[in-house]
Amino acid sequence: MTAPTLTDLIYLKKNYLSEEQCKTIIDEYQKSMCVEDRENCFHAFTGLNTTSTYTVKTCQQDSKSFNIIHQTVGNIINEYHDYLDTFDAFHVSRRASMLYPHKYRLMKYSKGAWIHPHVDDDGAGINGSCTINLNSEYEGGTFAFWGGKHKVKLGRGDVMIWPADYSFWVHEVEEITEGTRYSANCFLCDKPKFDYTQDVKYDVKGSDVAIGY
């Protein structure tokens, strides 16, 4: 068997959520009274702190959308580890590395919106990223890794998970040229973050193994 490549570590599950489930999550964004925020982080290639043009709201704990997203991400994490096992190449302790969400971000990319090349790891326990694409009524908005050298076109209900090791997993969302893209995203952590209560945790098979790097 050949050695796994970087692109092998990106796991995509097509049509995982139904149209109805996707609509439920979009509806929370549209009806939520939460502040519609913008985010900023360092541009991977210039090092400049850059504000992106999409808007974001935090999914409210115990809402219908929250439960859909939480169950989906937990299932995908388990599938991802089972998939990685097929390479017979990775440390078993990785199963204890993605047990908690940072938070569930509901994201809206209107026409002209994008997110610049960046990484998700903050140096404090973010080990993976997961995104759920919620609609397909838009043009542009392609998910791109490594300056566009690897691109993934996501459809409604698609779920994608990948590692978030600092500096290597540079990714972006290209500009929306028509329509509006909705997505849900979360960072996957080995310890609880501040956004949700500590009982918000994934039931990951084999996660009782000690982490040892």
Where would I find each of the regions flagged by the language model?
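Fe(II)/2-oxoglutarate oxygenase catalytic core
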Residues: 1-159, 167-213
